């Protein structure tokens, strides 16, 4: 399994990258322009994206999806996926770092970003404002310090505990279901501590401001692999109301990207790039058979 070399305590480097941007498309050489126009799906892109020469995509730190390395490079599943999609679309992606799910969603609505790849689940409410291409699934996991394993490595231990999670994320809604299970068992509900990003949730665990950090299963696997002697995690079960959530790349409705983006995903499913990326990052269990557009609202 491929893992990130960064650990939770290094994620604060995000702030210094907020102003980074890619080189303008106007500086591309004629050869590069010709290559872009020859990409299979370039003609399907909206004129605004062709003119910009780039797809601006919001992103926060959420290993293994996105990790800010010491030299400033952003690595992870998301950049690898973007590289494969760019081969089909003919334009690169530019990750613009931000914090907070609400800020990234509203940023798309105000045209600061063309897209956002979460990880964030699609819902009927979100599909009212955004087009969503589902490309993977997740189960919620709860990370704890391994030194507290005797105390916390038990599903019932989470009941009544302090759980840090990103405000508005899948973790928040999944914890509500977990709390229903806790109460059915005669146990106290967990307390949700809403924070801006994944980095903040892990730091809360490290500093004993929270007992657990709620996150995606792939992020929990990556964090434990990066520091196996420091972290453990629980996985929310079906009995505890987990189910499986569909994670999607979001685009504002009306920006013209939905159909070409779906076609790009279909292409990388067909040519094996999707399977390769999911396998390299050890998240085959979260793979889907095919990408879908707006599955929560399509008839």
Question: How should each PLM-predicted stretch be described?
Answer:
Residues 35-39, 79-88, 148-149, 156-157, ...:
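Extended ligand-binding regions for polar small-molecule ligands
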Residues 20-30:
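Bacterial lipoprotein signal-peptidase II cleavage site
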Residues 137-144, 225-266, 283-299:
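Periplasmic-binding protein-like
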